[in-house]
A protein has these predicted regions:
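Non-transmembrane alpha-helical segments in soluble domains
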Residues: 1-8, 50, 57, 61-64, ...
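Active-site His/acidic residue clusters
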Residues: 2-49, 87-93
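Loop/turn elements at helix/coil->beta-strand transitions in domains of secreted/extracellular proteins
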Residues: 9-16, 72-78, 114-116, 186-189, ...
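Metal-dependent active-site segment of extracytoplasmic phospho-/sulfohydrolases and closely related
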Residues: 13, 19-20, 55-94
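Active-site-proximal beta-strand/loop segments in catalytic clefts of secreted hydrolases
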Residues: 18-22, 30, 81-84, 114, ...
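Short acidic-aromatic active-site loops that bind/stabilize oxyanions
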Residues: 46-54, 142
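C-terminal cap/loop subdomain of S1 sulfatases and analogous C-terminal strand-loop tails that border
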Residues: 86-111, 126-131, 135-141, 145, ...
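Structural micro-motif
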Residues: 115-119, 153
């Protein structure tokens, strides 16, 4: 917070990367919210997981309130996403549980192990804001085209109107059209996941997804 406050006071842009560890094993309950879930019937571990999700949500809410209080919410882009498939203690690696309605969970070869939540929004939408006019984001919309973490770097550069260093190879692409709720026919629709190094809730595998199709190859 101190670094952001300093940047705001100096009229400089800032970048904050906030990685929550809370929604991760071991699932130690956040006791601020435990009473809300004690009669869920889902078991102690699942109840603990739910409190961690709510705690993370509270943390993000606090951050957004800080941006509002500092008067920079309209100028701040928030990208909220997971780093892997769901890991809630609900069902096994190949079940429709922690990532329902997707099958599988963290470490599995199924969509529930690969696809993650990804929300992009201005902290305070304002159609008249000069930054939001240059980089509009559709509200209350779901984008079905895929994006990956590799797309974040070129997207952030685009928002900031910064060009990458000359001869610097980019693996990703700007998500601007996708954020607008439009189809980007130039955006890649294939994705390769190569995981033959060791077992983590699944077999040794490689998966390749193209459009609505997915190929899974098992090494044994």
């Amino acid at each position: 917070e101190a670094e952001m406050t300093k940047a705001i006071q100096e009229g400089k842009p800032f970048y904050l990367n906030m990685s929550h560890y809370a929604v991760h094993q071991p699932f130690e309950a956040d006791h601020r919210y435990l009473d809300k879930y004690k009669d869920s019937g889902k078991g102690h571990m699942a109840e603990a997981f739910a409190t961690l999700v709510e705690g993370m949500d509270k943390s993000l809410g606090d951050l957004m309130q800080y941006l509002e209080d500092q008067g920079v919410a309209e100028n701040t882009l928030i990208l909220f996403l997971g780093d892997n498939g769901g890991d809630a203690p609900l069902g096994g690696p190949a079940d429709y549980g922690s990532s329902a309605p997707l099958r599988g969970k963290k470490g599995s070869e199924y969509e529930g192990g690969v696809r993650v939540p990804f929300i992009a929004a201005w902290a305070k939408p304002d159609a008249k804001n000069k930054f939001q006019k240059k980089y509009p984001i559709a509200q209350n919309a779901v984008q079905l085209q895929q994006g990956t973490v590799m797309d974040l770097y070129p997207t952030i550069l685009s928002v900031a109107h910064v060009k990458p260093p000359k001869h610097y190879a980019l693996d990703g692409a700007d998500l601007k059209k996708l954020f607008q709720g439009k189809e980007d026919k130039k955006h890649r629709d294939d994705f390769l996941m190569h995981f033959p190094h060791g077992e983590h809730r699944a077999n040794y595998f490689t998966t390749y997804r193209k459009g609505d199709w997915k190929l899974i190859y098992y090494y044994h």
